Amino acid sequence: MLQKPRGTQDFFLDETKLWIKVETKLREILNKFNYSEIRTPMFESKELFIRSIGSTSDIVSKEMYEFVDKKNRSLVLKPEGTASVVRAVVENKLYAEDYLPFKTYYISPMFRYERPQNGRYRQFHQLGIEVYGSDSIQQDYEVLNIANNIINDFKLNKNIKIYTNYLITGKNREQYILELKKYLTDFKLCNDCNIRIEKNPLRVLDCKIDDKQFNNVPSMKDFLTDEEQKRYQQTLDLFKEMNISTIHDDKLVRGLDYYTGFIFEIKYEAKNIEQTIIAGGRYNNLVYEIGNINLPACGFGMGLERFINIIKEQNNKLNKNDQSIDLYTICLDQSAIKLNQQILELSRSIGLISDSNYYNMSLKSALKKSDKLNPKYLIILGEKEATSNQFIIKNKINKTEIKTTLTNFVNDLK
């Protein structure tokens, strides 16, 4: 029997309803901050991700789904969303003054060839928000505040921590990297990190195998320029003034090479589980790397699979099955088909979710199906109802019944 590819999922029934509720609520939150949705292609040029993510990253070196098209062009299923948005900004000239700051978001599937595990899939879904054209610390605050609003609005505050750091971009970067390499020589590193330490030592701190042993890593804060120190402190002060609690983490570097300056991760830490659910920061050089245009940018990404798993774990009310149908009709005779369809059309015209027993079944089976759907109203139609054009509406909530006709049907439902 054919099965779905490893690391992918099928969504249906209650699971799909939960996803739609989550996505709808996320869009409502982002609309309040005046962010508009962007949709980019599912596949892009391979070169786009080499330029943006970095050739030494795990994503580019190991995890991309690559293919060559009929004209011998190297393409990949997009492994992350930011590079695609930057490409769209440059290609469509969204850096023009009239558009700035360009505030946008996406909800999209991504693809990475990695080992499937709890909360990690080869096809996964990501919410991303992006802001282009603003280098203000207020913009950094807004980005983290949106993430914080998402956590609060979904009532997931329990076991949540926000970690921050500031990646060196100034003249002291090379000095810090030398100090870091010196520190790392005392450790036995995994094969990947032995390569990273030569190409990009900062990436060693993001290693999921070795990171637990780096307890006294040199602090980036000690190497920041006066200007960087001032900006980072002003950003942290603003968070504190606005009652957003953060924790500085010297080892926080992010898994993508394009980040510069302020970065953050929001983690869910419970029992023996530690998962990053939202992560982002500044990437002021990325638009230049891709499109040769100086344009500051910041944003974050959120894995929806992990986020929805936490909703389920915390027994969030969004995960509760609410009444999913307003009206169910049971049609027991061929002569009642027209009346049945007329009732359904009328009920849907006033916004009721309505269904019927289209599958040929007995009254007993149809009533069992009705009990499963738990409708507010139930109507049973047979030859008698078709002949008289009268039928009974059963209110399953308050256990009342009313006899009506098509003419009075809508009024009698109110």
Curated annotation (Swiss-Prot):
Gene3D superfamilies: Anticodon-binding domain (3.40.50.800), Bira Bifunctional Protein, Domain 2 (3.30.930.10). Its main location: cytoplasm. GO terms for biological process: histidyl-tRNA aminoacylation. The keyword Signal does not apply. It is an enzyme of class 6 (ligase). Keywords: Aminoacyl-tRNA synthetase, ATP-binding, Cytoplasm, Ligase, Nucleotide-binding, Protein biosynthesis. InterPro entries: aa-tRNA-synth_II, aa-tRNA-synth_II/BPL/LPL, Anticodon-bd_dom_sf, His-tRNA-ligase, HisRS-like_core, HisRS/HisZ. GO terms for cellular component: cytoplasm. It is found in: Cytoplasm. Homodimer. NCBIfam families: hisS (TIGR00442). Belongs to the class-II aminoacyl-tRNA synthetase family. This is Histidine--tRNA ligase.
